[in-house]
Amino acid sequence: MTLPRSLRWTGDHLDLLDQRCLPHTVVYRQLTHWREVSEAIRSMAVRGAPAIGVAAAWGVVLAAKAGDDLDQAIEGLRASRPTAVNLSWALNRMQTSAKSNGWVDVHQLERLASAIEAEDRALTQALVNHGVGVLPEDCRVLHHCHTGAVATAGVGTALGVIVAGHQRGIVKHAWLDETRPRLQGAALSAWELGCCGVPATVIVDGASGLLMRRGQVDVVLVGCDRVAGNGDVANKIGTYNLALAARAHGVPFYVCAPSSSIDITTVDGDAITIEERPEDEITHFRGELVCASGVRAWNPAFDITPAHLITGLITEFGVIRSPSRESIASLPFAN
């Protein structure tokens, strides 16, 4: 089965795959205003750090076509989700381009948004090619959240490595954390691997340590929303727990990090803003209260995994073993 594209630019509007409707229904939303793009990012109709960066770039194009204040549109899009650096990465490029002539060149912005989308396709493919090289033969991979094709404009990051590894006869099985509270692993990763013919089993997030203890995990692969200059990683809540369990059981722990997710200007993980989402994502399920009435919930969307727990960062340039400030600063884009 061919996976649907995460987004499609038509020339006058953005068709956006609504990931909230997956896995049961494929629905595209027709977005004609940058505020609609911002709301789609905030509500997680589009999610995955690379995908939201590309979507935001097209949001700027929509603002330019409408004659809206571009600075206001860019800052509105930037505020939609604060943790993933891909969002600011794309918006900063669009803002620089918009100001380069002293006037708004809509066609120039459209070409740049198209280039950002094409770059994501190319760099995710390069990342996947490098990632397959770290996999042991006949391996069982544990994955957290969702990092597949619909979370990018291309083939995905960590999940893309799993798919490619299976196609090459290296990956035997994938374990998928369900990833509370939004269930991206159960709803999206399981669906995507099923479409690609990869054998997979969904587990509750708390089962990963037991799997490792029993020797049923050979490698952990995750994505990221931001890598700080020292190698600390912000990723979906629960990633830090996985890294601790992997270290305790001697399981390699790799983070797939395209250069658009690496922020050398952020000193370390403590400097990364962690998005906190609504309490009802935890207290309610499909609109029904599942907690005792009046119980409060804390819902950070991300956590920080320190660099010393990471076996390697898989980038489009290659694999950075034991990431550090020095090794990240040596990457081509950092100079």
Curated annotation (Swiss-Prot):
Keywords: Amino-acid biosynthesis, Isomerase, Methionine biosynthesis. InterPro entries: IF-2B-related, IF-M1Pi, IF_2B-like_C, Initiation_fac_2B_a/b/d, M1Pi_N, NagB/RpiA_transferase-like. Substrate binds at R47, G48, A49, R81, Q184, N235, K236. Pathway: Amino-acid biosynthesis; L-methionine biosynthesis via salvage pathway; L-methionine from S-methyl-5-thio-alpha-D-ribose 1-phosphate: step 1/6. One of its GO terms (molecular function) is S-methyl-5-thioribose-1-phosphate isomerase activity. The record marks C145 as: Transition state stabilizer. GO terms for biological process: L-methionine salvage from methylthioadenosine. The keyword Amino-acid biosynthesis applies. The active site is at D225 (proton donor). Belongs to the eIF-2B alpha/beta/delta subunits family. MtnA subfamily. Catalyzes the interconversion of methylthioribose-1-phosphate (MTR-1-P) into methylthioribulose-1-phosphate (MTRu-1-P). This is Methylthioribose-1-phosphate isomerase. It comes from Synechococcus sp. (strain CC9902). The gene is mtnA.
